[in-house]
Amino acid sequence: MEAIAKRLDACQEQLLELYEENSTDLHKHVLHWKCMRHESVLLYKAKQMGLSHIGMQVVPPLKVSEAKGHNAIEMQMHLESLLRTEYSMEPWTLQETSYEMWQTPPKRCFKKRGKTVEVKFDGCANNTMDYVVWTDVYVQDNDTWVKVHSMVDAKGIYYTCGQFKTYYVNFVKEAEKYGSTKHWEVCYGSTVICSPASVSSTTQEVSIPESTTYTPAQTSTLVSSSTKEDAVQTPPRKRARGVQQSPCNALCVAHIGPVDSGNHNLITNNHDQHQRRNNSNSSATPIVQFQGESNCLKCFRYRLNDRHRHLFDLISSTWHWASSKAPHKHAIVTVTYDSEEQRQQFLDVVKIPPTISHKLGFMSLHLL
Protein backbone atom coordinates (compact mmCIF):
# COMPACT_ATOMS: atom_id res chain seq x y z
CA MET A 1 0.00 0.00 0.00
CA GLU A 2 2.84 2.39 0.83
CA ALA A 3 4.35 1.95 -2.62
CA ILE A 4 1.04 2.77 -4.32
CA ALA A 5 0.50 5.75 -2.01
CA LYS A 6 3.94 7.18 -2.81
CA ARG A 7 3.48 6.74 -6.56
CA LEU A 8 0.00 8.25 -6.42
CA ASP A 9 1.29 11.25 -4.44
CA ALA A 10 4.06 11.81 -6.99
CA CYS A 11 1.62 11.51 -9.88
CA GLN A 12 -0.87 13.95 -8.37
CA GLU A 13 1.92 16.35 -7.47
CA GLN A 14 2.99 16.41 -11.12
CA LEU A 15 -0.62 16.92 -12.21
CA LEU A 16 -1.00 19.92 -9.93
CA GLU A 17 2.24 21.41 -11.23
CA LEU A 18 0.88 21.09 -14.77
CA TYR A 19 -2.38 22.78 -13.73
CA GLU A 20 -0.46 25.60 -12.06
CA GLU A 21 1.77 26.06 -15.09
CA ASN A 22 -1.29 26.31 -17.36
CA SER A 23 0.94 25.82 -20.39
CA THR A 24 -0.08 26.25 -24.02
CA ASP A 25 2.59 23.76 -25.15
CA LEU A 26 1.07 20.62 -26.66
CA HIS A 27 3.91 18.52 -25.20
CA LYS A 28 2.71 19.45 -21.71
CA HIS A 29 -0.81 18.28 -22.49
CA VAL A 30 0.50 14.92 -23.70
CA LEU A 31 2.32 14.66 -20.36
CA HIS A 32 -0.90 15.59 -18.56
CA TRP A 33 -2.76 12.67 -20.12
CA LYS A 34 0.13 10.32 -19.38
CA CYS A 35 -0.20 11.29 -15.71
CA MET A 36 -3.98 10.81 -15.84
CA ARG A 37 -3.42 7.36 -17.33
CA HIS A 38 -0.88 6.49 -14.61
CA GLU A 39 -3.23 7.71 -11.87
CA SER A 40 -6.06 5.53 -13.19
CA VAL A 41 -3.78 2.48 -13.25
CA LEU A 42 -2.73 3.05 -9.64
CA LEU A 43 -6.30 3.51 -8.43
CA TYR A 44 -7.42 0.44 -10.36
CA LYS A 45 -4.68 -1.64 -8.74
CA ALA A 46 -5.51 -0.25 -5.30
CA LYS A 47 -9.13 -1.30 -5.70
CA GLN A 48 -8.07 -4.77 -6.81
CA MET A 49 -6.06 -5.01 -3.59
CA GLY A 50 -9.20 -4.27 -1.60
CA LEU A 51 -8.28 -0.72 -0.59
CA SER A 52 -11.11 1.75 -0.08
CA HIS A 53 -8.89 4.74 0.80
CA ILE A 54 -5.35 5.86 0.09
CA GLY A 55 -4.68 8.45 2.72
CA MET A 56 -7.62 10.84 2.53
CA GLN A 57 -8.52 9.89 -1.03
CA VAL A 58 -11.39 7.53 -1.75
CA VAL A 59 -10.51 4.77 -4.20
CA PRO A 60 -13.20 4.74 -6.93
CA PRO A 61 -14.86 1.57 -8.27
CA LEU A 62 -12.96 -0.49 -10.82
CA LYS A 63 -15.29 0.54 -13.66
CA VAL A 64 -14.64 4.23 -12.97
CA SER A 65 -10.86 3.87 -13.00
CA GLU A 66 -11.05 1.65 -16.08
CA ALA A 67 -13.18 4.17 -18.00
CA LYS A 68 -10.92 7.08 -17.05
CA GLY A 69 -7.89 5.06 -18.05
CA HIS A 70 -9.38 4.29 -21.46
CA ASN A 71 -10.19 7.98 -21.96
CA ALA A 72 -6.64 8.95 -21.01
CA ILE A 73 -5.17 6.43 -23.47
CA GLU A 74 -7.42 7.73 -26.24
CA MET A 75 -6.48 11.36 -25.60
CA GLN A 76 -2.77 10.59 -25.29
CA MET A 77 -2.71 8.72 -28.61
CA HIS A 78 -4.55 11.43 -30.53
CA LEU A 79 -2.48 14.25 -29.03
CA GLU A 80 0.74 12.41 -29.85
CA SER A 81 -0.56 12.07 -33.41
CA LEU A 82 -1.34 15.79 -33.52
CA LEU A 83 2.11 16.47 -32.11
CA ARG A 84 3.64 15.14 -35.33
CA THR A 85 1.92 17.78 -37.47
CA GLU A 86 2.47 21.47 -38.09
CA TYR A 87 -0.44 22.22 -35.76
CA SER A 88 1.72 21.24 -32.78
CA MET A 89 3.32 24.68 -33.01
CA GLU A 90 -0.01 26.38 -32.30
CA PRO A 91 -0.93 27.30 -28.72
CA TRP A 92 -3.15 24.71 -27.05
CA THR A 93 -4.87 25.06 -23.68
CA LEU A 94 -5.87 22.39 -21.17
CA GLN A 95 -9.48 22.99 -22.05
CA GLU A 96 -8.91 22.57 -25.79
CA THR A 97 -7.22 19.22 -25.17
CA SER A 98 -9.72 17.98 -22.58
CA TYR A 99 -11.83 14.86 -23.01
CA GLU A 100 -15.01 16.91 -22.60
CA MET A 101 -14.03 19.16 -25.51
CA TRP A 102 -13.06 16.09 -27.52
CA GLN A 103 -16.60 14.75 -27.04
CA THR A 104 -18.29 18.08 -27.78
CA PRO A 105 -19.94 18.16 -31.25
CA PRO A 106 -18.37 17.59 -33.68
CA LYS A 107 -17.16 14.62 -31.66
CA ARG A 108 -13.66 13.19 -31.85
CA CYS A 109 -12.26 16.39 -33.31
CA PHE A 110 -10.15 19.08 -31.72
CA LYS A 111 -11.69 22.53 -31.98
CA LYS A 112 -10.95 26.14 -31.15
CA ARG A 113 -12.58 29.55 -31.10
CA GLY A 114 -16.28 28.88 -30.92
CA LYS A 115 -19.08 31.32 -31.65
CA THR A 116 -22.67 31.03 -30.48
CA VAL A 117 -25.47 30.68 -33.01
CA GLU A 118 -29.03 31.22 -31.76
CA VAL A 119 -31.85 29.26 -33.37
CA LYS A 120 -35.47 30.31 -32.78
CA PHE A 121 -38.12 27.63 -33.23
CA ASP A 122 -41.77 28.22 -34.24
CA GLY A 123 -41.08 31.96 -34.44
CA CYS A 124 -41.28 32.13 -30.64
CA ALA A 125 -38.73 34.34 -28.90
CA ASN A 126 -39.00 32.20 -25.78
CA ASN A 127 -38.21 28.99 -27.64
CA THR A 128 -34.57 29.37 -28.60
CA MET A 129 -31.51 27.17 -28.47
CA ASP A 130 -27.82 28.02 -28.69
CA TYR A 131 -25.34 26.04 -30.77
CA VAL A 132 -21.64 26.48 -31.48
CA VAL A 133 -19.83 27.21 -34.72
CA TRP A 134 -16.11 26.55 -34.46
CA THR A 135 -13.62 28.72 -36.31
CA ASP A 136 -11.05 25.91 -36.32
CA VAL A 137 -11.89 22.21 -36.44
CA TYR A 138 -9.05 19.69 -36.54
CA VAL A 139 -10.23 16.52 -38.28
CA GLN A 140 -8.27 13.29 -38.57
CA ASP A 141 -8.28 12.08 -42.17
CA ASN A 142 -6.28 9.00 -43.20
CA ASP A 143 -3.86 9.20 -40.27
CA THR A 144 -3.24 12.89 -40.80
CA TRP A 145 -4.85 16.01 -39.38
CA VAL A 146 -6.63 18.66 -41.44
CA LYS A 147 -7.77 22.05 -40.15
CA VAL A 148 -11.17 23.12 -41.50
CA HIS A 149 -13.83 25.67 -40.54
CA SER A 150 -17.43 25.33 -39.47
CA MET A 151 -20.17 26.79 -41.65
CA VAL A 152 -23.88 27.50 -41.12
CA ASP A 153 -26.74 27.07 -43.56
CA ALA A 154 -30.47 26.49 -43.25
CA LYS A 155 -29.97 22.75 -42.74
CA GLY A 156 -27.52 22.95 -39.88
CA ILE A 157 -23.91 23.48 -38.84
CA TYR A 158 -21.22 21.54 -40.67
CA TYR A 159 -17.62 21.36 -41.77
CA THR A 160 -16.21 20.21 -45.10
CA CYS A 161 -13.23 17.87 -45.26
CA GLY A 162 -12.17 17.11 -48.81
CA GLN A 163 -15.36 16.52 -50.79
CA PHE A 164 -17.41 15.43 -47.80
CA LYS A 165 -19.73 17.73 -45.89
CA THR A 166 -20.36 16.61 -42.30
CA TYR A 167 -23.26 18.10 -40.34
CA TYR A 168 -22.83 17.95 -36.59
CA VAL A 169 -26.02 19.95 -35.89
CA ASN A 170 -29.14 19.15 -37.93
CA PHE A 171 -31.80 21.85 -37.56
CA VAL A 172 -34.52 19.54 -38.93
CA LYS A 173 -33.99 17.09 -36.07
CA GLU A 174 -33.66 19.92 -33.57
CA ALA A 175 -36.95 21.43 -34.78
CA GLU A 176 -38.65 18.08 -34.24
CA LYS A 177 -37.41 18.06 -30.66
CA TYR A 178 -38.03 21.67 -29.68
CA GLY A 179 -40.72 22.89 -32.07
CA SER A 180 -44.08 21.89 -33.49
CA THR A 181 -44.28 23.73 -36.83
CA LYS A 182 -40.87 22.61 -38.18
CA HIS A 183 -40.03 26.26 -38.72
CA TRP A 184 -36.83 27.83 -37.43
CA GLU A 185 -34.72 30.94 -37.81
CA VAL A 186 -30.94 30.96 -37.46
CA CYS A 187 -29.54 34.18 -36.00
CA TYR A 188 -25.80 34.50 -36.50
CA GLY A 189 -24.41 37.97 -35.95
CA SER A 190 -26.36 40.26 -38.27
CA THR A 191 -27.42 37.37 -40.52
CA VAL A 192 -30.80 35.63 -40.26
CA ILE A 193 -31.43 32.38 -42.16
CA CYS A 194 -34.96 31.00 -42.29
CA SER A 195 -35.89 27.37 -42.74
CA PRO A 196 -36.64 26.69 -46.43
CA ALA A 197 -39.84 25.13 -47.73
CA SER A 198 -37.66 22.24 -48.88
CA VAL A 199 -34.46 21.71 -46.94
CA SER A 200 -32.83 20.27 -50.06
CA SER A 201 -33.09 23.59 -51.86
CA THR A 202 -30.19 25.97 -52.27
CA THR A 203 -29.23 27.42 -48.91
CA GLN A 204 -27.21 30.34 -47.75
CA GLU A 205 -23.85 29.60 -46.20
CA VAL A 206 -22.27 31.73 -43.51
CA SER A 207 -18.62 31.58 -42.55
CA ILE A 208 -17.11 32.75 -39.31
CA PRO A 209 -15.82 36.33 -39.09
CA GLU A 210 -12.32 36.20 -37.68
CA SER A 211 -12.67 39.42 -35.73
CA THR A 212 -15.52 38.23 -33.54
CA THR A 213 -14.26 34.89 -32.26
CA TYR A 214 -13.54 34.12 -28.66
CA THR A 215 -10.70 32.16 -27.10
CA PRO A 216 -10.52 30.80 -23.56
CA ALA A 217 -7.80 33.30 -22.69
CA GLN A 218 -10.03 36.20 -23.70
CA THR A 219 -12.81 35.10 -21.41
CA SER A 220 -13.16 37.28 -18.34
CA THR A 221 -13.31 35.66 -14.92
CA LEU A 222 -16.55 37.42 -14.17
CA VAL A 223 -19.05 37.47 -17.01
CA SER A 224 -21.62 40.23 -17.14
CA SER A 225 -25.17 39.05 -17.57
CA SER A 226 -25.73 41.85 -20.05
CA THR A 227 -23.12 40.54 -22.50
CA LYS A 228 -24.76 39.95 -25.86
CA GLU A 229 -22.37 37.38 -27.22
CA ASP A 230 -21.10 34.86 -24.67
CA ALA A 231 -17.81 33.03 -24.98
CA VAL A 232 -18.11 29.35 -25.66
CA GLN A 233 -16.93 28.47 -22.14
CA THR A 234 -19.79 30.40 -20.54
CA PRO A 235 -23.15 28.65 -20.63
CA PRO A 236 -25.90 31.10 -21.58
CA ARG A 237 -28.99 31.51 -19.43
CA LYS A 238 -31.18 29.79 -22.01
CA ARG A 239 -30.93 26.14 -22.89
CA ALA A 240 -27.76 25.37 -24.75
CA ARG A 241 -26.73 22.64 -27.12
CA GLY A 242 -23.36 21.73 -28.51
CA VAL A 243 -21.29 23.17 -25.64
CA GLN A 244 -20.10 21.17 -22.65
CA GLN A 245 -18.29 22.57 -19.73
CA SER A 246 -14.62 21.81 -19.90
CA PRO A 247 -12.74 19.66 -17.30
CA CYS A 248 -10.34 22.39 -16.35
CA ASN A 249 -12.67 25.28 -17.37
CA ALA A 250 -12.14 27.43 -14.41
CA LEU A 251 -10.90 30.23 -16.61
CA CYS A 252 -14.53 31.25 -16.98
CA VAL A 253 -16.60 31.46 -13.79
CA ALA A 254 -20.30 31.89 -13.30
CA HIS A 255 -21.29 34.00 -10.29
CA ILE A 256 -21.71 31.93 -7.14
CA GLY A 257 -24.83 32.70 -5.18
CA PRO A 258 -24.81 33.21 -1.42
CA VAL A 259 -23.63 30.25 0.60
CA ASP A 260 -26.02 31.10 3.41
CA SER A 261 -29.31 32.51 2.17
CA GLY A 262 -29.66 34.43 5.43
CA ASN A 263 -26.51 36.39 4.83
CA HIS A 264 -26.96 37.79 1.33
CA ASN A 265 -25.22 41.00 2.30
CA LEU A 266 -22.12 39.11 3.40
CA ILE A 267 -21.09 37.59 0.08
CA THR A 268 -17.97 39.04 -1.48
CA ASN A 269 -16.23 38.40 -4.79
CA ASN A 270 -12.77 38.72 -6.27
CA HIS A 271 -13.31 42.38 -7.11
CA ASP A 272 -14.40 43.32 -3.59
CA GLN A 273 -12.11 41.51 -1.21
CA HIS A 274 -12.10 44.26 1.36
CA GLN A 275 -15.81 44.04 2.19
CA ARG A 276 -16.32 43.18 5.87
CA ARG A 277 -19.01 41.32 7.70
CA ASN A 278 -22.10 43.08 8.91
CA ASN A 279 -22.02 43.64 12.68
CA SER A 280 -25.39 41.92 13.04
CA ASN A 281 -23.88 38.69 11.64
CA SER A 282 -20.82 38.37 13.87
CA SER A 283 -21.24 34.58 14.08
CA ALA A 284 -20.54 34.10 10.36
CA THR A 285 -17.41 32.15 9.46
CA PRO A 286 -15.18 33.36 6.61
CA ILE A 287 -14.90 30.91 3.72
CA VAL A 288 -13.43 30.58 0.25
CA GLN A 289 -15.14 28.51 -2.42
CA PHE A 290 -12.86 27.09 -5.08
CA GLN A 291 -14.27 26.06 -8.48
CA GLY A 292 -12.73 23.95 -11.19
CA GLU A 293 -12.42 20.50 -12.68
CA SER A 294 -12.73 17.73 -10.08
CA ASN A 295 -9.23 16.34 -10.55
CA CYS A 296 -7.67 19.81 -10.35
CA LEU A 297 -9.46 20.48 -7.06
CA LYS A 298 -8.55 17.08 -5.67
CA CYS A 299 -4.84 17.71 -6.29
CA PHE A 300 -5.14 21.24 -4.92
CA ARG A 301 -6.86 20.00 -1.75
CA TYR A 302 -4.11 17.43 -1.28
CA ARG A 303 -1.47 20.16 -1.45
CA LEU A 304 -3.37 22.37 1.01
CA ASN A 305 -3.57 19.55 3.56
CA ASP A 306 0.06 18.66 3.01
CA ARG A 307 1.69 22.10 3.02
CA HIS A 308 -0.70 24.75 4.32
CA ARG A 309 -2.75 23.03 7.01
CA HIS A 310 -2.04 25.85 9.50
CA LEU A 311 -3.60 28.47 7.21
CA PHE A 312 -7.24 27.27 7.39
CA ASP A 313 -9.72 25.54 9.69
CA LEU A 314 -11.82 23.06 7.68
CA ILE A 315 -11.84 21.88 4.07
CA SER A 316 -14.64 19.99 2.31
CA SER A 317 -14.59 17.19 -0.21
CA THR A 318 -15.41 18.12 -3.81
CA TRP A 319 -19.12 18.72 -4.36
CA HIS A 320 -21.49 19.93 -7.08
CA TRP A 321 -24.77 21.78 -7.27
CA ALA A 322 -27.43 19.15 -7.95
CA SER A 323 -30.24 21.45 -9.07
CA SER A 324 -31.04 21.82 -12.75
CA LYS A 325 -30.91 25.59 -12.14
CA ALA A 326 -27.29 25.41 -10.99
CA PRO A 327 -25.24 28.33 -12.40
CA HIS A 328 -22.44 25.99 -13.51
CA LYS A 329 -21.30 22.36 -13.48
CA HIS A 330 -17.88 22.92 -11.93
CA ALA A 331 -16.79 20.93 -8.91
CA ILE A 332 -16.51 22.99 -5.72
CA VAL A 333 -14.34 22.79 -2.60
CA THR A 334 -15.20 24.94 0.41
CA VAL A 335 -12.53 26.06 2.90
CA THR A 336 -13.35 27.73 6.25
CA TYR A 337 -11.15 29.97 8.39
CA ASP A 338 -10.97 31.01 12.03
CA SER A 339 -10.88 34.70 11.08
CA GLU A 340 -10.74 37.03 8.13
CA GLU A 341 -7.09 37.67 8.98
CA GLN A 342 -6.32 33.96 8.61
CA ARG A 343 -8.18 33.90 5.31
CA GLN A 344 -6.21 36.86 4.02
CA GLN A 345 -2.96 35.22 5.11
CA PHE A 346 -4.03 32.09 3.25
CA LEU A 347 -4.68 34.08 0.07
CA ASP A 348 -1.35 35.88 0.42
CA VAL A 349 0.67 32.69 0.84
CA VAL A 350 -1.06 29.97 -1.19
CA LYS A 351 -0.52 29.90 -4.94
CA ILE A 352 -3.87 29.14 -6.60
CA PRO A 353 -3.58 27.48 -10.03
CA PRO A 354 -5.01 29.59 -12.87
CA THR A 355 -7.34 26.73 -13.78
CA ILE A 356 -9.06 27.08 -10.38
CA SER A 357 -11.17 30.13 -9.56
CA HIS A 358 -12.26 31.27 -6.12
CA LYS A 359 -14.90 33.37 -4.42
CA LEU A 360 -14.95 34.81 -0.91
CA GLY A 361 -17.94 34.60 1.40
CA PHE A 362 -19.26 33.76 4.85
CA MET A 363 -21.17 30.85 6.33
CA SER A 364 -23.29 30.78 9.47
CA LEU A 365 -21.78 28.67 12.21
CA HIS A 366 -24.90 26.57 12.60
CA LEU A 367 -24.32 25.22 9.08
CA LEU A 368 -20.92 23.76 9.98
From Swiss-Prot:
Family affiliation: Belongs to the papillomaviridae E2 protein family.
One Gene Ontology term of the molecular function aspect: DNA binding
Name of the protein this chain belongs to: Regulatory protein E2
Polar residues bias spans: 208-226
Top-level lineage group: Viruses
Record bears the keyword Repressor: yes
Entry's Gene Ontology cellular component terms: host cell nucleus
Xref: InterPro entries: E2/EBNA1_C_sf (IPR035975), Nucleotide-bd_a/b_plait_sf (IPR012677), Papillomavirus_E2_C (IPR000427), PPV_E2_N (IPR001866), Reg_prot_E2 (IPR033668), Regulatory_protein_E2_N (IPR036050), Regulatory_protein_E2_N_1 (IPR042503), Regulatory_protein_E2_N_2 (IPR042504)
Region of interest: DNA-binding domain: 284-368
Subunit and interaction comment: Binds DNA as homodimer. Interacts with protein E1; this interaction greatly increases E1 DNA-binding activity. Interacts with protein L1; this interaction enhances E2-dependent replication and transcription activation. Interacts with protein L2; this interaction inhibits E2 transcriptional activity but not DNA replication function E2. Interacts with protein E7; this interaction inhibits E7 oncogenic activity. Interacts with host TAF1; this interaction modulates E2-dependent transcriptional regulation. Interacts with host BRD4; this interaction mediates E2 transcriptional activation function.
Compartment(s) of residence: Host nucleus
Region annotation Transactivation domain: where it falls in the sequence: 1-200
Gene that encodes it: E2
Pfam annotation, one family: PPV_E2_C
Keywords: Activator, DNA replication, DNA-binding, Early protein, Host nucleus, Phosphoprotein, Repressor, Transcription, Transcription regulation
